Each structure stands twice: as C-alpha cells, then as structure tokens.
Swiss-Prot record:
Species assigned in the record: Homo sapiens
Name of protein: Complement C1q tumor necrosis factor-related protein 4
GO molecular function, one term: cytokine activity
Induction: Up-regulated by IL6.
Cell compartment(s), UniProt: Secreted
Region (Disordered): 164-195
KW Signal (keyword) present: yes
Subunit record text: Homomultimer. Forms trimers, hexamers and high molecular weight oligomers.
Annotated tissue distribution: Widely expressed at low levels. Highest levels in adipocyte tissue and brain.
Domain of life: Eukaryota
Length: 329
C-alpha cells in the first residue's frame, strides 16, 4: 500500500512520509489526497468538495464534505493547488475548524482565456476532532476552473502520547524537527536608508515549531539533528513589483528560488520546494531581493508561508557544525 501512496501523492509526500511505521503502529497512519475535476463558482462561502480520491489511509477524509477530521493528534502537512477559471479571480483558503484561516492561495489575474493555478502549503498542529478544509471565496467574481483543485495531507509526527505503545518497554524517542510559519505583512524593497541588506525574511505567525529549531523573528532555521529535510515556501507578488526570493543555506549557498518580473497590477503567487541534506548547525532561510522595484505581498490571509521538517535523520556520526550565528550574515 505504501508504494502506491507514494506514487500518487508525488515527490513531496514521498519525502514527508518518512520510514514505514513499525509493527502495531498502523492505526497511527493518516494520509489523504483528493481532486476536484469540475468547476465551482462562488455563490456563498462554501467548502470545496471533491469527486476523486487517490489515497485515504485511516479514512479521515470525507470526500462528500471536503473535510479532513483529525483522528491521531499530531503535526500534519497540508498542500493544495487550485485552478483559476478564465475571467474570474481565485481565492481559496485553508481553514481549520469552523473559521480559522491558516493560509491562502490567490490569483486575481483576469485576462481573457487565462487558465492559471496557485498552490499553498502549511504544517498544522491538530488535536483530536479538529477539521481542515478548503473554502472558496463566496463572491461571484471568484471561481475554480476545470480541473478544479487537488488537496493532500498527511501525519508527519504523531503526538508523543498518541504513539506510545500499549505494552512493553518504552521505545527510544523519535528524532523530530519541524516548523511552519507565515508572514502577514508585505515586504517592499528599497535602495534608501541605512542598515544591513540581504537579511533573512522574518515571520510573525508560527503554526508549528517542534524542537524549537526555527527562530521566526530572525527567519532562520538552524539544524539540530543532521539528516534530510524537506522545505517548501510560497509568496505573493506585489502589483507592478518583481518577486525574487531565494532559499538559502548558510551564508550564500542558493538552493532554490522563485521569480516573477511581470508588470501586472494583479496579485499572484508562486511556490517552491526542495529537499536538503543538512549538518548540525547549518542555517536555512529565505532571502528577498532588497532593492527598489522588488517586493512580496501578504496580509492577514497569510500569502507568505515557510515550512520544513526532518524526513530521515543521519545514521552516520555527526559532521562538523555549520556556520555560527555571527557568520550567517
């Protein structure tokens, strides 16, 4: 079953699911991936429902309502992609429980015949009974195109009390490190003013910080457990500004980037993801081009997100540490 799941969810899911759980732990597995293949127009604030299910391990996703209901408390990674209908804007929110908006996918480009898509992802800490779903903005100028959307989620780390064995000696603690954060303020580059340039992109909202390895105010993740990590980030584009954001390792090692120099006055979004092998002390952060004409857009809907988590810890002896804080910038 696991190979089928990995094939259907794609590379990100393969990385995130990690090692196969041991005997007796099948009840702690929870993963889903679903798709909507038909358009949907906004007429009232509504949940996005789905007509195709690729994976539903644990049966925690209800395709008819479009809701995932948490059965195993823990940290979950969610990702979704929504297609935009021609002549319409796109606004799809990741919602927890009744009305807690966690992140947003948005595109207001309304050129005739334009078919586009926007993606978003976030890791959330869920309790038993929490629900997570997608909501399409209810105003008539918003709509999903065809194909409409995909929505996936999976348990990365079960809470410690959830995965404790019922019998036998306690298992050694599982190496864990994960974070997910958002920024609710836009960022505008400027050539004026004093102060250091090329600072990490800071965040003001923290969804998850397992292990305490991410400093939201500084915008830096520092590796505590050597191993393979998955990182994803999404940013909104300011109208008439160039979007240029790089995923950095340590001081000047560019790992991945997103870029859009379109002159449109409409707000749009871009996403990127990558897997990195990190040593203890390595720093990972986002760098926004800090000059006139550049910028990134966000608001309370949380357009800007940044997530990362340990997939596989190293089994070999630890390598020398990476850069210290004073050497990063």
């Amino acid at each position: 079953m696991l190979p089928l799941l990995l094939g259907l969810l794609g590379p990100a899911a393969c990385w995130a699911l990690g090692p196969t759980p041991g005997p007796g732990s099948s009840e702690l597995r929870s993963a889903f991936s679903a798709a909507r293949t038909t358009p949907l127009e906004g007429t009232s604030e509504m949940a996005v429902t789905f007509d195709k299910v690729y994976v539903n391990i644990g049966g925690d996703f209800d395709v008819a309502t479009g809701q995932f209901r948490c059965r195993v408390p823990g940290a979950y990674f969610f990702s979704f992609t929504a297609g935009k209908a021609p002549h319409k804007s796109l606004s799809v929110m990741l919602v927890r429980n009744r009305d807690e908006v966690q992140a947003l996918a948005f595109d207001e480009q309304r050129r005739p015949g334009a078919r586009r898509a926007a993606s978003q992802s976030a890791m959330l800490q869920l309790d038993y009974g929490d629900t997570v779903w997608l909501r399409l903005h209810g105003a008539p100028q918003y709509a999903l195109g065809a194909p409409g959307a995909t929505f996936s989620g999976y348990l990365v780390y079960a809470d410690a009390d959830a995965d404790a064995p019922a019998r036998g000696p306690p298992a050694p603690p599982e190496p864990r490190s994960a974070f997910s954060a958002a920024r609710t303020r836009s960022l505008v580059g400027s050539d004026a003013g004093p102060g250091p340039r090329h600072q990490p992109l800071a965040f003001d909202t923290e969804f998850v910080n397992i292990g305490g390895d991410f400093d939201a105010a500084a915008g830096v993740f520092r590796c505590r457990l050597p191993g393979a990590y998955f990182f994803s980030f999404t940013l909104g584009k300011l109208p008439r500004k160039t979007l240029s954001v790089k995923l950095m390792k340590n001081r000047d090692e560019v790992q991945a980037m997103i870029y859009d120099d379109g002159a449109s006055r409409r707000r749009e979004m871009q996403s990127q993801s990558v897997m990195l092998a990190l040593r203890r002390g390595d720093a990972v952060w986002l760098l926004s081009h800090d000059h006139d004409g550049y910028g990134a857009y966000s608001n309370h809907g949380k357009y800007i997100t940044f997530s990362g988590f340990l997939v596989y810890p190293d089994l070999a002896p630890a390598a020398p540490p990476g850069l210290g804080a004073s050497e990063l910038l």
